[in-house]
Amino acid sequence: MSSPHVLVVDDTLVDRHVVSMALMRHNVRVTAVESVMQALMFLDSEHDVNMIVSDYCMPDMTGYDLLMEVKKSPKLAHLPVVIASSDNIPERIRKCLDGGAKDYILKPVKIVDLPRILNYI
């Protein structure tokens, strides 16, 4: 069985790198992109993604926008989406979870978050 493949979406290079490296330490293949549009283009052409971890606050489109695009697509709706944000805003957290996100984690993503996140694959 091949390693799980996670798409990491974050407009901040450091945050993309931190999440990617943490996942790779758990034998996860990672593709990292910097925008929702890049994520959607990648998902349109790539069929072996097992989960998406997305920042919430990004220019142009938010992680919630990505979540909505994924959930309305018959091809992608099955994918678990985890939203990561440095903002602990209860209304935003509820909106994402009600919209179908598997989890909403606070940044910086910590090593202790990974087993829970990886359990969604």
Curated annotation (Swiss-Prot):
PROSITE patterns: RESPONSE_REGULATORY (PS50110). SUPFAM superfamilies: CheY-like. Disruption phenotype: Dwarf, narrow leaf and low tillering phenotypes. Expressed in flowers and panicles. It holds the Pfam family Response_reg. It comes from the Eukaryota. Keywords: Cytokinin signaling pathway, Phosphoprotein, Transcription, Transcription regulation, Two-component regulatory system. The modification 4-aspartylphosphate is found at residue 55. Functions as a response regulator involved in His-to-Asp phosphorelay signal transduction system. Phosphorylation of the Asp residue in the receiver domain activates the ability of the protein to promote the transcription of target genes. Type-A response regulators seem to act as negative regulators of the cytokinin signaling. This is Two-component response regulator ORR12. The lineage of its organism: Eukaryota, Viridiplantae, Streptophyta, Embryophyta, Tracheophyta. The gene is RR12.
